[in-house]
Amino acid sequence: MRLVNSLGRRKILLILAVIVAFSTVLLFAKLWGRKTSSTLDEVGSKTHGDLTAENKNGGYLPEEEIPDQPPATGAFNYGEALQKAIFFYECQRSGKLDPSTLRLNWRGDSGLDDGKDAGIDLTGGWYDAGDHVKFNLPMSYSAAMLGWAVYEYEDAFKQSGQYNHILNNIKWACDYFIKCHPEKDVYYYQVGDGHADHAWWGPAEVMPMERPSYKVDRSSPGSTVVAETSAALAIASIIFKKVDGEYSKECLKHAKELFEFADTTKSDDGYTAANGFYNSWSGFYDELSWAAVWLYLATNDSSYLDKAESYSDKWGYEPQTNIPKYKWAQCWDDVTYGTYLLLARIKNDNGKYKEAIERHLDWWTTGYNGERITYTPKGLAWLDQWGSLRYATTTAFLACVYSDWENGDKEKAKTYLEFARSQADYALGSTGRSFVVGFGENPPKRPHHRTAHGSWADSQMEPPEHRHVLYGALVGGPDSTDNYTDDISNYTCNEVACDYNAGFVGLLAKMYKLYGGSPDPKFNGIEEVPEDEIFVEAGVNASGNNFIEIKAIVNNKSGWPARVCENLSFRYFINIEEIVNAGKSASDLQVSSSYNQGAKLSDVKHYKDNIYYVEVDLSGTKIYPGGQSAYKKEVQFRISAPEGTVFNPENDYSYQGLSAGTVVKSEYIPVYDAGVLVFGREPGSASKSTSKDNGLSKATPTVKTESQPTAKHTQNPASDFKTPANQNSVKKDQGIKGEVVLQYANGNAGATSNSINPRFKIINNGTKAINLSDVKIRYYYTKEGGASQNFWCDWSSAGNSNVTGNFFNLSSPKEGADTCLEVGFGSGAGTLDPGGSVEVQIRFSKEDWSNYNQSNDYSFNPSASDYTDWNRVTLYISNKLVYGKEP
């Protein structure tokens, strides 16, 4: 019996050993085989809980409960950071938003006419950054990077309760890409004109400008953007295979067709609308290889792998060497570095791809051949002033992926992983401030983001503080000396973008996997509405014995969400007791208007007893938070009694609190939307209604204006500009000096930079209005090289489209200056009234994006982080120098 038991136990142990060994092999195959040549077929056959292709809500996944979390061991709550970084993409959504699943109340439907100009539905997708253009190159890159994060760290997303959220955000973008691909060789790569879009500052829900659609096809191709979209959809086909097999197949179908389109055309000749915003500087071969690698992983078709490798000699080399490039970063323009890493793992040897990715990561960490990326004093690996954190955190994500690779160098893997942690921690606040909105200590509160700011006045200055919290947004980041300004106008340091968060999400997933941290189970972006959104301001224009004249201004400052109102009305209540006592009636009262912005006025109507009202109906007049003339409408109306009759306003309900010479918000003048009370209180009501919690429809009517200006930028070499004939004969009129002041702020304080970003404020302290078309500003600098230069106006209170920029060479170079940028204004800029000011935020760069040395520039002031008087920039009015000193 003992022998049998002993033999039985041995058999059992042997069987268990075999099972364990076999399970280990399967696990290894799953984890690492998928990272070499697996197509995830064996994984794709499984389901995730009860999620299937039959899930409701258009294929979007339901919100999941956050599982119990293990104890956190890291310096930060990486789970919360991951949760919020994913949420940021919900804030960027364009199109029709489902209120049943929306996790924030300050976003609504927007861009619902996108594609109508082309007869196609192009709604959906993400707005690019703090603007509202849908640029498909950075958008598809962002979707691809988010998908890669899920591919690598799916378990982290599940454990943190963020799996469905990230899949839904990726699907939101991919659904849009599929819409953009209506035919095999046709792809719509952009919606919205960048110049017109940047000329307006307001919420997405009430955009007034036309939004043209741009496409590439076989006659005018765009291989870069098409291949990047192919990559995004190929990755989506892999990660959605578990939860929605049909959708996975649809993504793969489009990915294959788009790749063939990009690969057989090999040209970006048709990709023109994004020039000046998202040029494809690295060419298209990196995107072709990147897409081919992902298609190989999605299909196991080795022809894609062969194709990816065949372009490796076209990815680029370091200047004057035969060394594959390594001194940049994975980004929307250049996906070479991610391709290095994927091919290194697939080949799984010590070949050229492994050498290439290690060379790249070495340069970012310990250095390569005695050279290393710049590090700030506080530890940020700093590549460039535009999105410095974006580059560091994305490279850190690649470092994490390398560290997981079984065949990677173990010592390097440790170094890379420590680098990744340090960069994640820098972004989250290791220096004493967080660079993620709504997270950690001293986070950014004023990101360069139109909808989060919530202006109703087409102005970065109104309101002075942001109305909404853009949770999870990673801002651009500091300069090379750790300097950072939380300023809405500083788009260099403080803009946010879809591609900024893309690699950051993957990095946070790895940090969460290593160190834990608890996402907030109650987190959302639902905000209290702290102010009246729709209301009337009123005052007394004039009065006499038998009349009262009221000036009333209807305001729409809606922001939860912003919305267009076309059916507003208000009522002015009066008590006609004195009229009745004089033997007259309501029919004897006359209502007239001397000034009216689109309203219809009723006769006096009965309310109850001796209380009557005049209804001012603005139906058909669009009032929306889109600018000074858009968000408010004024009506001046008079109520007159017959001659010899006294009209006493003191007993009128709506007269309460009104006075002459000023207007005040009045709850006694109730406002209605389509007949529903949305602000104020009627006579006899116990409490007032406010637009904070009204039942206004969240549907946003389309705003159209009669015409929209298109902002322009000069894109010419300095030598193409003739030195102005008046350059050496400028009249020195010091008599007006002091009446007009030019202030300067530096939007980019780096000594070495590939763009110069001055900001100007002109202040009129005089007594006369200034015609802005007579005004010129000059900024003096050294050009360093012969490349032509580009000029952009990023924002101006005079309207971007009304700002011009011209470069010219000084006839006699001076110390610190051989070139001058002259900024002017078009006739549409209007006048600058006494006591007023106008702001201009511009930037310029060389066509080849080579660096300037700002440190020796005459007009450069590195300490001017905010507006300050600076006499090394000059101001001219009608060719008279009125401020500053020429070099």
Curated annotation (Swiss-Prot):
Entry keyword annotation includes Signal: yes
Keyword annotations from UniProtKB, A to Z: Carbohydrate metabolism, Cellulose degradation, Glycosidase, Hydrolase, Polysaccharide degradation, Repeat, Signal
Residue numbers annotated as active site: 131, 448, 486, 495
Signal peptide: 1-55
Reaction(s) this enzyme catalyzes, per UniProt: Endohydrolysis of (1->4)-beta-D-glucosidic linkages in cellulose, lichenin and cereal beta-D-glucans
EC number: 3.2.1.4
Described purpose of this protein according to its UniProt entry: This enzyme catalyzes the endohydrolysis of 1,4-beta-glucosidic linkages in cellulose, lichenin and cereal beta-D-glucans. Principally active against barley beta-glucan.
Family: Belongs to the glycosyl hydrolase 9 (cellulase E) family.
Protein name, per record: Endoglucanase 1
Species for this entry: Acetivibrio thermocellus (strain ATCC 27405 / DSM 1237 / JCM 9322 / NBRC 103400 / NCIMB 10682 / NRRL B-4536 / VPI 7372)
Gene that this polypeptide is encoded by: celI
